[in-house]
Amino acid sequence: MTFYYIRILRLQEKLEESFKYALRVVFTITSDLGEVSYPQDATVRVEALDRQQSHSRITISKQCVSWIGNGHAAETTLYFPASHQQIQLTLHLENQNSIVDSIHINADTVLPVWSEAFSPKSTLPNMVWRYIQGPEKKSPNDGLWFLEQMGNSIAKHLWDAGVVFSKKILSDDWHYSFSNRKDINVLELGSGCGIVGISIASKYPRALVSMTDTEDAIEFMEKNVEKNKSAMSNNITSDILVWGHDIPRKFRRHWDYIVMSDVMYNESSFSDLEASLQELMDKNTKLYIAYKKRHDNEKTFMSNILGWLDLVYEERGPITIYILQKK
């Protein structure tokens, strides 16, 4: 299983005539950290949608663009009347429905992308959206939306382990089923965009979910909470928690579950993360770790925590998931 992400790299507009608007769209298809380009030839459908009415998606311009395998970028220009007031771009593979197929986890899955809505002749968007369908699969609105930074940077993007772990949580796989009793407490460490915590809160409305990260991630996380509030029951919070420092009093409580995905990319933080886990966990806490192998030093972290944690369950693959408890 390999994930690739269509990423909008640049938007450039010009008014060709008083009534005609042209928008240049430059995009790429890469892995989550941008280190590998999509290796297959493909056709990407680039569409401009009229979003004047919030629930309508009327295509006003479209182009099919050839992507050359292992390429760096591709581009096209869309033309449409300048009279449209709310425009949204969507990019997806030509053989892929822009909503439905984005949620299937198959080999070489390419995730579509949506821009934020914008008005022609105004400031162009610098954020985009990703879509994860919910468990009911009844309609295109049955799902979760996650904001990302436009471009090909590492920060403020969904990473593979979070996408896979969220899909596991939203599925019927009993290994990833949490207790449905009232007021279970779930803590997420290194929440990033919030995909895992929001997925848990949407599936378990009786749970109390606390997402945490450093200060610079909180605003982004809260935007995703706001976007998905209709899928939750006001049962989620976002807070600053710095690993290795004194744990604030509000976190000194029993946690039924602690979850984290793709947090083992920085070896210098391993000792602080382990120290925080030792302080936050008790005998009845289950710890879920989802990660994509990137460095051999991840084995060192796992070896250290297995000195005081028991391995309850392990799922190996491109994304490895561990479930652990205190000895």
Curated annotation (Swiss-Prot):
GO biological process per UniProt: cytoplasmic translational elongation
Keyword line: Cytoplasm, Nucleus
CDD domains linked to this entry: AdoMet_MTases
Cellular compartments per GO CC: cytosol; nucleus; protein-containing complex
TM segment ranges: none
Pfam families, per database record: Methyltransf_16 (PF10294)
Domain of life according to the entry: Eukaryota
Family: Belongs to the UPF0665 family.
Identification of the protein by name: UPF0665 family protein C23C4.06c
